[in-house]
Every structure is written in structure tokens, then in C-alpha cells.
From Swiss-Prot:
Organism: Pongo abelii (Sumatran orangutan)
Protein name, per record: T-complex protein 1 subunit zeta
Modified positions (Phosphoserine) in chain numbering: S205
Covalent crosslink: Glycyl lysine isopeptide (Lys-Gly) (interchain with G-Cter in SUMO2): K251
Assembly, per entry: Component of the chaperonin-containing T-complex (TRiC), a hexadecamer composed of two identical back-to-back stacked rings enclosing a protein folding chamber. Each ring is made up of eight different subunits: TCP1/CCT1, CCT2, CCT3, CCT4, CCT5, CCT6A/CCT6, CCT7, CCT8. Interacts with PACRG.
One of the record's GO cellular component terms: chaperonin-containing T-complex
Cell location: Cytoplasm
Organism lineage string: Eukaryota, Metazoa, Chordata, Craniata, Vertebrata
InterPro entries recorded: Chap_CCT_zeta, Chaperone_TCP-1, Chaperonin_TCP-1_CS, Cpn60/GroEL/TCP-1, GroEL-like_apical_dom_sf, GROEL-like_equatorial_sf, TCP-1-like_intermed_sf, TCP-1_chaperonin
Length: 531
């Protein structure tokens, strides 16, 4: 009888073989759910929430976040996989598949009496060799637009259908290249992802500027201005209460009038400063003038600005204020005390677009914008969500490639070559730990196997062909998902991120090792025993 039982009769305990069986079945269960998602030919999953909302996705990260996973071990694996996505932006499904397969291969040896500790030693030896092999096969190259397009396409085609992936690929790469600065980390927050329920998903485009999800608040303001000066400010153009708690008292109607006039004059002086600046920079030309304010603008001020032909937008979102100055230039002002023309930004075109009851303001044709907008279009909500998730992963894949300065061949090529390298390395490992290395090598082959299976080909036949081709040619050969034949991934331009593969090897080995070394599961916590 378990020691914990004597202390706590209500505790539930699973020991030795039973504990291992529970853990391995959980890992395999999760693997079976995500197995069909892998790769460009993977199938979709439909998630229906309690409220009846539908989400169509084949992104492993979205699935693991949205699914309600009850089993503690499966939940642990799901958290590791989603952490992989948070760090690198890809590899979630591969993570779950490899952990499941490592446990499955280990189970074969454990059922024959091998101790889990020996297998885990083999796993560690295999991981060291695999990481060393990854260093050898990585391709260091200049990250030009063409290479980045290949990287983005490889990532995006696993999330959305090929035609849409090709449209998104160029937009994603161009947006990163627009905001990239020499010797500085890439800040993906400088790429605004704006949704518009309109037209079809292939109309998604890159706007070299900014799109704001609101319009001007005055009916007489221009809907379109060209060659416009942009004044970005965070100054109240409406009467506001004082920040400290204060009161004003008047004895007569005349005094009240004076108070109202003083309040009004305070705002009017600010508006006059804007109008004077506009006259100074525009003169009699047709140039436009746009004021974008984070705080409010009252109807009187809007009226005065409108009469001068100034387009004014109020209550702009805070996150857009930084992007505005990066896209258009200029300075975001907190006071109008010393307004000067060199504080203004510039945009070639500013126009308002009305879609149903929603209004959008486009600020385009900026000179060298350091902040851009990806405008996602789609006919319905779940298409927009799916594209948004795909774009986020695509952006991170491109950023990773630039940060790493290298890529590795995809389509299962690295895994096949790595498995062969591990089998050659096996004799140099002492004793029974060799079996752990063998299990690790076999587990890695799950990736090319599942890629072939999801494309409708015989997985054993495809794998044998690829291994034979790799042995003969010595090149990194992957699966051609259209024909099921071997292909040299590097020649076709199928590239994966180096940091994703590296993280994958680390996290899968650690979690599989920890799960294998669990020999007792105790359900004896306070909360689990209530009732």
C-alpha cells in the first residue's frame, strides 16, 4: 500500500507501470488530435465554443489554447507546445508529435524491462548529437527578399490554403523589410494588423502607412486630401474639468458669462494656433492639413477647423500615436506653446473610407514609413481570425530568419538526415543507452511520416524512398507533398527556422524525459479531494 494512503485514505495513486501507462496514453491521445494538422496538406479542425461560436483552424497553437484539456499530463504537453509558439512562433504541432512519439518508442523498450533512466540517458546523448548535427546543416545566407519570401511561404502554407498564402507572403515580407532598421531588433508592434469585413481574403494588402478605424466627426470636412501635412497631438480641444478637485462660484449672470467666455477662449486660442500654422505651411496651395488628436475636439473647434479646410480626427488610439510619427514623421505634441512646421509629418494621401456604419481613415504614400499596416480582408469573422493567426506566425518566421541569419531545409529533410546521423552515432554511445538513441532517431521520423500521410501517400513507402535517396545523394531530401517523391528541399525553397528546430529538440527531450521518470502519480492535493 502506498505510503500516502496511510496518511490520506482518500488519495488516488497510480504507481510504476500504471503511472507510465497513464502518461503515455495522454501524450498519444494529444498526438492523435494534432496529427492530421501537420503541414500544408493538413486538415482543418472546427472548434465550437459553449456559446456556439465556430473557429476553423489548423494552427496547433490556436487549437491547444482553445481546447479544454482535462488530463494533467496532456495539459503539461500543451503548455510546452504553446510556450514554443510564444518563443518562436512555430513548431507547436511538431512539438506535440515528437513528444508523443518519443514516449511511444520508449514504451516499447520499457515493456521489455529496460529502466526508464537508461532511456533518458540515451535521449540526452541523442539530443547533444542532434543539436551538433543541426549546427552542421544550417544554411547561413544573406537574408534577401527572395529567401525571406521562401521562409514566409513555408510557414504560411501550413496555416492557410496555398493561393491565400502566396498573397500573404509578399505582404508579410515587405512589411518586415519596411520597419527593419540596421543593427536594431525588429519590433513587430510597429506592424498594425487591421481587420476589415469586406471583399474576399485574397484582397488582403500591405498599406505603407496607417489605417485608423474611425473617421472625421464633422459632416463638412474633406473626405480626401492629397500631399497633406500631419499634426499629431495629445492636447485637449474641448472644455475639461480640472484634474484637482476645484470649484468656481459666481454671484451674477454677468460673471457666469465671463466664466463661459474664458473657458471658450482657452480652447479657441489653441484652435487659432493650429489654423495659423496651417496658413503658414500651406499658404494658397492645394496642400492638405490633417490633425490627429488623442484627446477630444468639441463641435465648435471642429467647425472652426472645417471652415479652414483642415481634417481633424479625435480620440485616436494611444498605440497609433507612436506609429503615426514613425509612419509620417513629425513629433507627437503635448502642448501648442511653440508650434513650428518642422514638428509636422507628411503623407501623400489621406482619405476616409466608409463601410456600412464603420469608417476607416487611410494615411498612405508616406516617405520611408517605419510603421506599416497589414489590412486583412475577409467575408466573415472566422476567416479574418484564421488569417490574423497565420499572419502573426508568418511575421515571426521572417523575424526569426533575420535574427538567426540562417535557415534549415524543411519538408522533413532535417529530421530524416538527423535520424540517420544518430543511428551512425549510436555505436559510440556506451551500453544500453544506445537503445535511447535508437528510440530518439525513430521518433524524429514521425515528421516526414505524418507529412506524407496527410498528403494521401503511403507513409512507409515514402519514408523508405526518402531515406534511400538521402543515403545515395548525401543531400538533405524531404517529401514533395504533391507527388510523394523525394525532393531536395533547399532547391525548391522550402525553409524552416533554425531557432524553431533548436527549441524543438530542447523542449521535447526535457518533457519526454520528465514524463518517463514519473513513477507515481498522487492525486492528494486539497482541492482535488473536496466532496
Amino acid at each position: 500500500m502506498a505510503a500516502v494512503k496511510t496518511l490520506n485514505p482518500k488519495a488516488e495513486v497510480a504507481r510504476a507501470q500504471a503511472a507510465l501507462a497513464v502518461n503515455i496514453s495522454a501524450a498519444r491521445g494529444l498526438q492523435d488530435v494534432l496529427r492530421t494538422n501537420l503541414g500544408p496538406k493538413g486538415t482543418m479542425k472546427m472548434l465550437v465554443s459553449g456559446a456556439g461560436d465556430i473557429k476553423l483552424t489548423k494552427d496547433g497553437n490556436v487549437l491547444l489554447h482553445e481546447m479544454q484539456i482535462q488530463h494533467p499530463t496532456a495539459s503539461l504537453i500543451a503548455k510546452v507546445a504553446t510556450a514554443q509558439d510564444d518563443i518562436t512562433g512555430d513548431g507547436t504541432t511538431s512539438n506535440v508529435l515528437i513528444i508523443g512519439e518519443l514516449l511511444k518508442q520508449a514504451d516499447l523498450y520499457i515493456s521489455e524491462g529496460l529502466h526508464p533512466r537508461i532511456i533518458t540517458e540515451g535521449f540526452e546523448a541523442a539530443k547533444e548529437k542532434a543539436l551538433q548535427f543541426l549546427e552542421e546543416v544550417k544554411v547561413s545566407r544573406e537574408m534577401d527578399r527572395e529567401t525571406l519570401i521562401d521562409v514566409a511561404r513555408t510557414s504560411l502554407r501550413t496555416k492557410v490554403h496555398a493561393e491565400l498564402a502566396d498573397v500573404l507572403t509578399e505582404a508579410v515580407v515587405d512589411s518586415i523589410l519596411a520597419i527593419k532598421k540596421q543593427d536594431e531588433p525588429i519590433d513587430l508592434f510597429m506592424i498594425e494588423i487591421m481587420e476589415m469585413k469586406h471583399k474576399s481574403e485574397t484582397d488582403t494588402s500591405l498599406i505603407r502607412g496607417l489605417v485608423l478605424d474611425h473617421g472625421a466627426r464633422h459632416p463638412d470636412m474633406k473626405k480626401r486630401v492629397e500631399d497633406a501635412y500631419i499634426l499629431t497631438c495629445n492636447v485637449s480641444l474641448e472644455y475639461e474639468k480640472t484634474e484637482v478637485n476645484s470649484g468656481f462660484f459666481y454671484k451674477s449672470a454677468e460673471e457666469r458669462e465671463k466664466l463661459v467666455k474664458a473657458e471658450r477662449k482657452f480652447i479657441e486660442d489653441r484652435v487659432k494656433k493650429i489654423i495659423e500654422l496651417k496658413r503658414k505651411v500651406c499658404g494658397d496651395s492645394d496642400k492638405g492639413f490633417v490633425v490627429i488628436n488623442q484627446k477630444g475636439i468639441d463641435p465648435f473647434s471642429l467647425d472652426a477647423l472645417s471652415k479652414e479646410g483642415i481634417v481633424a480626427l479625435r480620440r485616436a488610439k494611444r498605440r497609433n500615436m507612436e506609429r503615426l510619427t514613425l509612419a509620417c514623421g513629425g513629433v507627437a505634441l503635448n502642448s501648442f506653446d511653440d508650434l513650428s512646421p518642422d514638428q509636422l509629418g507628411h503623407a501623400g494621401l489621406v482619405y476616409e473610407y466608409t463601410l456600412g456604419e464603420e469608417k476607416f481613415t487611410f494615411i498612405e504614400k508616406c516617405n520611408n514609413p517605419r510603421s506599416v499596416t497589414l489590412l486583412i480582408k475577409g467575408p466573415n469573422k472566422h476567416t479574418l481570425t484564421q488569417i490574423k493567426d497565420a499572419v502573426r506566425d508568418g511575421l515571426r518566421a521572417v523575424r526569426n530568419a533575420i535574427d538567426d541569419g540562417c535557415v534549415v531545409p524543411g519538408a522533413g529533410a532535417v529530421e530524416v538526415a538527423m535520424a540517420e546521423a544518430l543511428i551512425k552515432h549510436k555505436p559510440s554511445v556506451k551500453g544500453r543507452a544506445q537503445l535511447g538513441v535508437q528510440a530518439f532517431a525513430d521518433a524524429l521520423l514521425i515528421i516526414p511520416k505524418v507529412l506524407a500521410q496527410n498528403s494521401g501517400f503511403d507513409l512507409q513507402e515514402t519514408l523508405v524512398k526518402i531515406q534511400a535517396e538521402h543515403s545515395e545523394s548525401g543531400q538533405l531530401v524531404g517529401v514533395d507533398l504533391n507527388t510523394g517523391e523525394p525532393m531536395v528541399a533547399a532547391e525548391v525553397g522550402v525553409w524552416d527556422n533554425y531557432c524553431v528546430k533548436k527549441q524543438l529538440l530542447h523542449s521535447c527531450t526535457v518533457i519526454a524525459t520528465n514524463i518517463l521518470l514519473v513513477d507515481e502519480i498522487m492525486r492528494a492535493g486539497m482541492s482535488s479531494l473536496k466532496g
